[in-house]
A protein has these predicted regions:
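Soluble extracellular-acting proteins and domains
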Residues: 240-344
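Feature marking well-ordered beta-strand scaffolds used for ligand recognition
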Residues: 1-277, 293
């Protein structure tokens, strides 16, 4: 270049450049601490609890959002078994928090019999006084094939009173419904699995998510369209529990703006609690039978006669709670019965 101020006066040099010999090349020394991921894949907010959970690729965040304009970071958690922290779900009482690991970005088969149970799974934490404590994992239990992309993905709560139940999509692993009321021992209680799209080769597809909404489960299947399911009773989920869940209605639902689930004072809710006491031996069989009969009799009454019968039953339940192995559930049942007593 003959004149730097005039780009038109440029000459091309055709001679080659000489490379100088350089020895002992060293990487520059770091100029500060190494940073981690600087953004979150998903953030689930739970306004009624004043909390938010960020799934932030390499770790999970817990935030206090009681003042939404000034959120406070409470804790960050990591797990060497996790590849990609993807999404989060709170239990309804905010005593538990579940994070998903989308190992391989949802495009790999990670549910084979040879895959560890804690890879591409859900990590479950207890949450107390703003602190998380890891207690368990959940992974859909049915082994999948080499031609099925499968990993934990999106889902949400099913509003069964007294229990923490979630429905979740696992890509070609299907839709899984599981109970994490005991966070150290989660258990699958229902599932739907179409099988591989192509048994001879991996074709990406499966359930991106499973969500419960007003009595139905909606599964968005990437390759095969939308599936709609209804729950059916089993030993792990009674018709009374399903009926109680169906009483919770939404006008709209944003799964990442988690709503507080509230049940009306209704006989199906009371019977759901009784079924749980029977299943878990929370009261002697003689008492659960008597409570069932008392509820049936009260439901046939009306006005002051019904209120009097329910008041008597509530008092009996208060006494039952003092010696019950599941006192909290008995007290919850008593609260529902008192709500029925005062209902018009």
């Amino acid at each position: 270049m003959t004149d730097r101020s005039d780009p038109a006066e440029v000459k091309i040099l055709t001679d080659s450049l000489d490379a100088l010999g350089v020895k002992n090349i060293r990487m520059p020394a770091p100029r500060g601490p190494r940073g981690g991921p600087s953004q979150c894949h998903d953030i689930t907010v739970y306004p009624s609890a004043g909390l938010a959970a960020g799934a932030c690729s390499g770790y999970g965040l817990l935030l206090n959002i009681k003042d939404p304009l000034h959120p406070v970071r409470l804790q960050a958690v990591a797990d060497s078994n996790f590849s990609f922290w993807h999404s989060a779900t709170f239990s309804n009482d905010a005593s538990k928090l579940l994070y998903t690991d989308e190992w391989g970005g949802g495009t790999q088969p990670k549910c084979r019999a040879t895959d560890p149970i804690d890879w591409g799974a859900d990590a479950i934490f207890t949450l107390r006084n703003g602190k998380l404590n890891h207690v368990g994992y959940f992974k859909m239990p049915a082994a999948q094939t080499e031609t099925e992309n499968c990993v934990a993905h999106n889902g949400g709560l099913i509003p069964v009173p007294g229990r923490d139940i979630m429905v979740q999509g696992w890509y070609q692993g299907g839709v899984s419904v599981f109970d994490f009321t005991n966070p150290a021992h989660p258990k699958e209680i229902a599932y739907f699995d179409r099988g591989p799209i192509d048994a001879s080769k991996l074709v990406i597809g499966g359930y991106w998510a499973g969500y419960y909404y007003n009595g139905y489960i909606y599964g968005s299947e990437i390759a095969r369209g939308l599936d709609v399911f209804k729950l059916t009773p089993t030993a792990d989920l009674t018709q009374n529990e399903i009926d109680a869940a169906n009483l919770v209605r939404f006008n709209s639902l944003n799964p990442q703006m988690q709503p507080k689930l509230v049940w009306p004072a209704a006989f199906p809710v009371a019977r759901a609690y009784v079924d749980q006491l029977v299943r878990d031996n929370g009261l002697p069989a003689s008492r659960t039978t008597a409570i069932t009969n008392a509820l049936r009799s009260a439901e046939k009454l009306s006005g002051t006669a019904r209120a009097a019968a329910l008041k008597t039953l509530a008092g009996q339940l208060d006494r039952d709670a003092s010696g019950a192995s599941d006192a909290a559930r008995v007290r919850a049942l008593a609260t529902v019965v008192r709500g029925l007593e005062s209902a018009k």
